[in-house]
Amino acid sequence: WMEQGVTIFRVDNPHTKPILFWEWVIAEIHKTNPDVIFLAEAFTRPKIMSSLAKVGFTQSYTYFTWRVSKPEIMEYMNELVNGLSRNYFRPNFWPNTPDILPFHLQNQTENIFILRYALAATLSSSCGIYGPAYEFYENTPIAGREEYFNSEKYEVRFYDWKKTNRMTDI
């Protein structure tokens, strides 16, 4: 993949593999490709997320998705900015993911989608959205769950890429 110009790898659930394996793989790749970025898609205990960062994951998913109230966001930011991991853990803020439609986005208007993106973009130096689901404000969940009703994981979806709205204009 790197020979084809790919320089960013999102690793799904790296915390389910041995930490020493990732330390070895990342070090080997960085010997010849030091600019390659590894994004840990790891929603796990903070200690394990820190361990992944220490062995070379350049960025990591975070719990931003579930920090909703002002006190929750302030406490989490304080943890990231002032905690011990601030020297090696690089948070990547995602308002949603391919798997997760958080409760606070469910059945909501575009305003909350834009607000959450603005928070992600200004509170972290690295943010992402899972679009087009996010870009087009898909907000219908499976009842009682944090999952999309019409998830792209289970069906082929087609989108009108000429369609614009406040999010696509950002």
Model-derived features: positions:
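Active-site and adjacent substrate-binding regions of carbohydrate-active enzymes
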Residues: W1-I170
